[in-house]
């Protein structure tokens, strides 16, 4: 079966949880979380849950696992906490809990960041995607530019396809 055939069979409405990882953001100041929600809704998807957690491994782990255990959520998307500062632990936390990594997501995100956005600073960009308990997880940097790039160029075009592939044998 071709990729196009897979996409035709993919679900059209994906139920999502957004997790913003930040020590400083509030619901009022969380531009990246709001942008994720806006782009998902514009594409016809649903936001089932949203939360902001501190840059702490246990808080991140708990928020992601809650999303993956929720029966009405298909995908968990995180933003923030992906840099190289000591407190940036989102990537390490997600990497520890996923059962399977979608390696191409991080690779393509850095390539697009380099060619379309921030040039050589892309080598500092960290992004990861994977699967836990039959749910997809995508983790992006917290800048609105990075969120827009990841969402419009990678996540939204493949979201239904990713969920379809996971559902084939994870449930």
Where are the regions that the model predicts?
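Non-catalytic beta/alpha edge segments that cap or flank active sites
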Residues: 1-171
């Amino acid at each position: 079966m071709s990729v196009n055939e897979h996409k035709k069979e993919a679900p059209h409405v994906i139920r999502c949880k957004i997790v913003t990882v930040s020590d400083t953001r509030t619901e009022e100041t969380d531009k990246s979380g709001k942008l994720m929600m806006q782009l998902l809704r514009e594409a016809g998807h649903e936001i089932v849950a949203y939360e902001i957690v501190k840059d702490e491994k246990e808080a991140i782990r708990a928020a992601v696992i809650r999303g993956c255990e929720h029966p009405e959520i298909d995908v968990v998307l995180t933003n923030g906490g992906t840099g190289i500062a000591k407190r940036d632990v989102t990537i390490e936390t997600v990497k520890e809990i996923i059962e399977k990594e979608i390696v191409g997501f991080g690779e393509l995100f850095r390539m697009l960041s380099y060619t379309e956005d921030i040039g050589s600073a892309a080598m500092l960009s960290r992004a990861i995607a994977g699967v836990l308990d039959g749910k997809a997880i995508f983790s992006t940097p917290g800048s609105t530019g990075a969120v827009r790039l990841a969402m419009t160029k990678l996540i939204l075009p493949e979201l239904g396809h990713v969920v379809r592939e996971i559902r084939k044998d994870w449930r």
